[in-house]
């Protein structure tokens, strides 16, 4: 089959100047053979042109002759040299044009059908006289295998496949072949970086007037089920409908969908969820039985399906259903042959498809993230209003379920509070400076031109894609491997520091995206391991390479703002490094203070010793589990630790409140006139109050000012109780597993073998489904997701049984090591009379005033540091609001 793969709107390998430029001439056409412009359009005596009522815009479709059974003379056989085509003239006349034979007239006696014949015949959609083979046994679908002739252009296999008639009849379409009647399949046999140079192209460049892509949206997925995928696609479709319903917009309006391409990239043919693949089939984007394993002995690296669908999705009661006759959407589905991680999926998006389409704005969404109904528009608007905006992100929300039912789970509530405060204080502060440390890959956008490398191949994308070669490579160091676990942070840094440029990053509060959050301890531990390690090492990289800001073209004041922000980030990183030590010191000081005579006395001393011992035991347990056990195999232990640290936090909150109240009572009963000013002279009181008000008070005030205070009511308590878990469980596991640089999704690619295509002199044969098979296959795919999913329990495999046995061995090993460590610690404490035993055993009981003074000084420094950092965040958030009032987005 002839290839559609011309370069970026070119024909025959040469670029056709765009309309509206000085180079463009409506009556000229670039001919690759002659290397010069040809004269005005002249009609062929044999070629009949179609007239369509649906649209005046004609797509250069793969000609019908490319899939007949008869021998083909090849794409260049006996063509007249004086035949030329004027695409613009055909576009204006609303006539159908065969864009794959441009510059070459139909032969007088062709061995294949001419372009005047309808593609979809009465019986079969591929040829007049298909060859039938033996029918499949009863019980399966009664398929007829049809052998079809295909032509290749420069070694590339491209097929225009009719969509199932049962789908076609439910949606509006032209009477002739167009983007709604045919799905286009391309078998890519190259690396993403070679896609353009190998003469592959996409449909948007094959229209009589190539379509400009303003928005290029990518949805990356691994093995997400039909519910997660539908949730994302429903949000994307709503955004496209919103932009099509903006008649007064200069950019958008009725035909806005023609400026938007939605790309779905699935990471591995063996990994894609069959129900998700069935949804794509139901939309007409995917067809089973079309893909090939090899083309001329070259392995296929990606299967690319293109279709403009009228079929949208809806989700009710956990079941996905199709909704036909809706706003058209240009879909591009890339099914990678192998599982090569998300960063490789982005290579296909940016290096392969992005180079062909040359979009303005690229939007990145993870499957499972549901963008708000107009969120993508608001992201685009940020770029439209600020020419130097190189990247933007919206607010990531935790999915709370109907009526917030998911908040019953304290883990979900804690993450909800964490996300909210990050979007209220952290992101606005960074946006005010112009540099956001990370644009979440789950929902963010970039200006395509800002990401491009320079002429030497150096730039943001070069650094970003370096992570693909580092992972699993023997030359990669531990620092670089961990750093590229958060490769989106590297991309943000390289974008803002791009040489001789002055791009900035922005936070768009109006754009929201909802995503599922881990609802079990083990899932949370595994997720945060990659987040914490990646962000920590990426932050070190950014601080160490701060000088690269000076190679950019930012103004002096912008660079000064970046310097202030990096000082702030450095202080935060230092506190994060010492978080586990700081928490223990605060715990020790508060529990020891409760043992004083004017507070709890002897009871406080005993409680302090008991909690100190338990603290040590559970912290050691965290270390032992983190260094040897899989979280999935130690779920109960991790859950027990969450409960213990919550109890510790309750005790600390009681201690802080009790000490502050006692200080007030002591001042009231001192015999002097009580006043507020006198109260603040009490160092214990004002240190605690300043710290608490600077943290909790600022959280509340900022949330109210942002008109988003509800998380303070629904999630604040849960967040406070689980704060020690973040410090003593998640941080410990992350640092104990810095050697683990995996993403947790890499697996064996054992997948069904596909047929291959071999050609001679540009032609070959392949098996393709006929029309009856298309309908039966389409019905079968629809049935896959038309009912609620019922999990089929399968007996454990040998590998699973072995893994379970290994979990048991690890559990025994953990118990032995824990007993050994605890008994040795108890022996040392008894011999040395330390760990608080000296306070509850008979003795002098002399206090160490010097140690007490040091503790008070330490507490003062820590609490005032918290106050200053919180106040700085608050000021940044307020400045963001002021700027947002004038900017409008």
Curated annotation (Swiss-Prot):
Name recorded for this polypeptide: Chitin synthase I
Alphabetic keyword roster: Cell membrane, Cell wall biogenesis/degradation, Glycoprotein, Glycosyltransferase, Membrane, Transferase, Transmembrane, Transmembrane helix
Gene disruption: observed consequences: Leads to delayed conidial germination.
Biological process according to GO: ascospore wall assembly; chitin biosynthetic process; septum digestion after cytokinesis
Skewed-composition ranges (Polar residues): 126-137
Glycosylation sites: 43, 199
Name of encoding gene: ChsI
EC number(s) reported in the record: 2.4.1.16
One term under GO cellular component: chitosome
Disulfide bridge positions per record: none
Topology of this chain in the membrane: Multi-pass membrane protein
The organism's taxonomic lineage, starting at the top: Eukaryota, Fungi, Dikarya, Ascomycota, Pezizomycotina
Molecular-function GO terms, alphabetical: chitin synthase activity
Pfam families in the cross-refs: Chitin_synth_1 (PF01644), Chitin_synth_1N (PF08407)
């Amino acid at each position: 089959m002839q290839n559609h793969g011309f370069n970026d709107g070119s024909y025959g390998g040469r670029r056709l100047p765009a309309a509206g430029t000085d180079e463009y001439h409506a009556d000229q056409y670039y001919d690759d053979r002659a290397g010069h412009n040809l004269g005005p359009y002249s009609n062929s005596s044999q070629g009949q042109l179609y007239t369509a009522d649906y649209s005046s815009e004609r797509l250069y479709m793969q000609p019908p002759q490319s899939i007949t059974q008869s021998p083909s003379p090849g794409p260049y056989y006996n063509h007249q040299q004086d035949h030329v085509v004027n695409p613009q003239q055909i576009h204006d006349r609303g006539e159908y044009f065969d864009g794959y034979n441009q510059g070459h007239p139909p032969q007088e006696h062709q061995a294949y059908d001419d372009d005047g014949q309808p593609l979809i015949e009465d019986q079969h959609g591929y040829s007049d006289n298909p060859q039938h083979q033996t029918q499949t046994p009863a019980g399966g679908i009664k398929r007829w295998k049809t052998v079809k002739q295909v032509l290749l252009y420069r070694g590339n296999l491209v097929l225009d496949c009719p969509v199932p008639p049962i789908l076609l009849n439910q949606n509006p379409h032209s009477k002739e072949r167009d983007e709604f009647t045919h799905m286009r399949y391309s078998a890519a046999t190259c690396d993403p970086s070679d896609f353009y140079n190998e003469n592959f192209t996409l449909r948007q460049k094959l229209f009589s007037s190539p379509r400009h892509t303003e928005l290029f949206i990518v949805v990356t997925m691994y093995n997400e089920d039909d519910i997660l995928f539908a949730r994302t696609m429903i949000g994307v479709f709503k955004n496209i409908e919103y932009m099509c319903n903006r008649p007064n917009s200069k950019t958008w309006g009725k035909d806005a969908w023609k400026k938007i391409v939605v790309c779905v990239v699935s990471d591995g043919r063996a990994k894609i969820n069959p129900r998700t693949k069935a949804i794509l089939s139901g939309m007409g984007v995917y067809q089973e039985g079309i893909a090939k394993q090899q083309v001329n002995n070259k392995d296929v690296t990606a299967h690319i399906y293109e279709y403009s669908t009228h079929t949208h999705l809806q989700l009710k009661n956990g079941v996905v259903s199709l909704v036909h006759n809706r706003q058209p959407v240009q879909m591009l589905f890339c099914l990678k042959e192998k599982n090569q991680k998300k960063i490789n999926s982005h290579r296909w998006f940016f290096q392969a498809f992005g180079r062909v389409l040359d979009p303005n704005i690229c939007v990145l969404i993870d499957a499972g993230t549901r963008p708000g109904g107009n969120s993508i528009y608001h992201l685009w608007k940020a770029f439209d209003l600020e020419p130097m905006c190189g990247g933007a992100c919206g607010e990531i929300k935790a999915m709370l379920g109907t009526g917030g039912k998911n908040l019953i789970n304290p883990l979900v509530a804690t993450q909800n509070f964490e996300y909210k405060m990050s979007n209220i204080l952290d992101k606005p502060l960074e946006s005010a400076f112009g540099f956001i440390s990370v644009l979440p890959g789950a929902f963010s956008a970039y200006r395509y031109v800002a990401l491009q490398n320079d002429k030497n191949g150096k730039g943001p994308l070069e650094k970003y894609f370096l992570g693909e070669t580092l992972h699993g490579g023997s030359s990669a160091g531990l620092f670089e491997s961990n750093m590229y676990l958060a490769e989106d942070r590297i991309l943000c840094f390289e974008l803002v520091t791009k040489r001789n440029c002055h791009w900035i990053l922005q936070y768009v509060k109006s754009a929201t995206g909802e995503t599922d959050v881990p609802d079990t301890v083990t899932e949370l531990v595994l997720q945060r391991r990659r987040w914490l390690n990646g962000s920590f090492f990426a932050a070190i990289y950014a601080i160490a390479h701060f000088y690269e800001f000076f190679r950019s073209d930012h103004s002096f004041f912008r660079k000064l703002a970046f310097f202030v922000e990096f000082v702030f980030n450095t202080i935060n990183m230092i506190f994060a490094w010492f978080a586990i030590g700081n928490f223990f010191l605060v715990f020790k000081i508060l529990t020891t203070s409760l043992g004083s005579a004017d507070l709890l006395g002897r009871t406080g001393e005993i409680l302090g010793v008991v909690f100190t011992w338990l603290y040590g035991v559970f912290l050691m347990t965290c270390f032992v589990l983190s260094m040897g056990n899989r979280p999935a195999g130690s779920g109960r232990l991790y859950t027990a630790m969450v409960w213990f640290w919550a109890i510790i936090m309750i005790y600390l909150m009681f201690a802080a409140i009790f000490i502050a109240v006692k200080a007030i009572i002591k001042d009231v009963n001192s015999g002097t006139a009580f006043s507020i000013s006198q109260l603040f002279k009490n160092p214990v009181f004002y240190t605690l109050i300043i710290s608490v008000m600077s943290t909790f008070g600022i959280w509340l005030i900022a949330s109210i000012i942002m008109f988003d205070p509800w998380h303070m009511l629904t999630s604040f308590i849960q967040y406070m109780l689980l704060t020690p878990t973040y410090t003593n469980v998640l941080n410990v596991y992350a640092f104990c597993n810095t050697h683990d640089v995996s993403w947790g999704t890499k697996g064996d690619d054992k997948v069904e073998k596909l047929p291959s295509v071999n050609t001679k002199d540009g032609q070959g044969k392949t098996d393709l489904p006929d029309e009856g098979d298309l309908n039966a296959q389409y019905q079968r795919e629809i049935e896959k997701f038309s009912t609620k999913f019922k999990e089929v329990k399968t007996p454990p495999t040998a590998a699973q049984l072995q893994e379970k046995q290994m979990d048991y061995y690890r559990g025994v090993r953990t118990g032995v090591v824990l007993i050994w460590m605890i008994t040795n610690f108890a022996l040392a404490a008894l011999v040395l009379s330390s760990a608080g035993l000296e306070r509850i055993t008979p003795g002098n009981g002399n206090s160490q005033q010097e140690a007490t003074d040091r503790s008070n000084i330490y507490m003062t420094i820590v609490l005032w540091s918290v106050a200053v950092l919180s106040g700085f965040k608050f000021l940044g958030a307020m400045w963001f609001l002021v700027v947002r009032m004038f900017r409008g987005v």
